[in-house]
Amino acid sequence: MSNFYKLLKEKFPRKEDIVTEMINLEAICQLPKGTEYFISDLHGEYDAVDYLLRTGAGSIRAKLLDCFDWQKIVAVDLDDFCILLYYPKEKLAFDKMNLSASAYKTKLWEMIPLQIQVLKYFSSKYTKSKVRKQLSGKFAYIIEELLAEIDRNPEKKSYFDTIIEKLFELDQVEDLIIVLSQTIQVLIIDHLHVVGDIYDRGTQRKN
C-alpha cells in the first residue's frame, strides 16, 4: 500500500491535483459514448482497411447528413465534400488541375467553414484537452480560433475571414484543409479494436 501512495503522490503531489483529476474523470464519464470500431483479418487488405479508416466505415457521411441540411447548401455537393474529407491531398490536386484559379480559390473558401463546422460537431463528444491533442502542432492555435468563431458572430466575422485570407497569402490553405480532413478522420472513431489477424502480406504491408 505504501508503494501505491508513493506512486500516487508522484503523479498528484497536491490534494488539489487529486480532486481535479477525480472531477475530470467523473465528468468524462458523463460525455456521450465515443464510436468504437472492431476490425479483424487485416492481412493483405491494406487498401480496404485504409478506406474504412478514412471513411469511418461510413460514419463520416452519416454524420454529415445529421450535421447539415444539404438541400440548403446548394453550392457544395455532398459526395464531393466527402471525397475531400476522405482523400484531401488527392482531391485538392484533382480540383487544382481541373478548375480555374479563381474557381479553385472560391471552392477552398467554401470548404474551410464547412470543415470547421464538421470538426466542431464531431468533437462535441470529447473534452477540449482530447481534441487539442489531435490537432496538428502547425495549425493547432489557428484551428482552435476558427472553432471558437465558426458561429460567425457578426462583430467577429472579419476576424474569421482575416485568418483565412492570411492563410491564402502564405500559401497554407491547402495544408490546413488536409489537416482538418485528417483530424476529422481521427475523431470519428474513438477506439479502434483489432481483434484478429493483423499481419499484412500485401504490397502495402510496410504502411
Q: Each PLM stretch: what is its role?
A:
Residues M1-N207:
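Feature recognizes metal-dependent phosphohydrolase scaffolds
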